[in-house]
UniProtKB/Swiss-Prot annotation:
Function: Subunit of malonate decarboxylase, it is an acyl carrier protein to which acetyl and malonyl thioester residues are bound via a 2'-(5''-phosphoribosyl)-3'-dephospho-CoA prosthetic group and turn over during the catalytic mechanism.
S-S pairs: none
Keywords assigned by UniProt, alphabetized: Cytoplasm, Phosphoprotein
PTM summary: Covalently binds the prosthetic group of malonate decarboxylase.
Gene symbol of the encoding locus: mdcC
Protein name: Malonate decarboxylase acyl carrier protein
Species, as recorded: Pseudomonas syringae pv. syringae (strain B728a)
């Protein structure tokens, strides 16, 4: 198991929170909570050692050219593909966008 941390510039925190995915069902669980204004912080706990660059590139592609909301995101990964990770993050962003 490896724990990775990432930070990106962000806007204001949202009011909502979201939990998407279930670790036991497939490989990934993502918890999104309001964060510190101006900062998107992501903590990944993964069963795949040595994948920090893969995660970094995935997040950079997702947030390139946009300002995400200020969030604290916890990801529990057990070998999900980058496509599944992106889908779960997009589901979480969609969920927090609704009151």
């Amino acid at each position: 198991m490896e724990t990775l941390s990432f930070e990106f510039p962000a806007g204001q925190p949202p009011k909502g929170r979201a939990l998407v995915g279930v670790v036991g069902s497939g490989d990934l669980e993502v918890l999104l909570e309001p964060g510190k204004p101006g900062t998107l912080s992501i903590q990944v706990v993964t069963s795949v050692n040595g994948a920090a660059l893969r995660w970094q590139h995935l997040f950079e592609r997702m947030f390139d050219g946009q300002t995400p909301p200020a969030l604290s995101i916890d990801i529990h990964d057990f070998g999900a593909t980058p496509g599944v990770v992106r889908m779960r993050l997009e589901q979480g962003f969609e969920e927090i966008g609704h009151d």
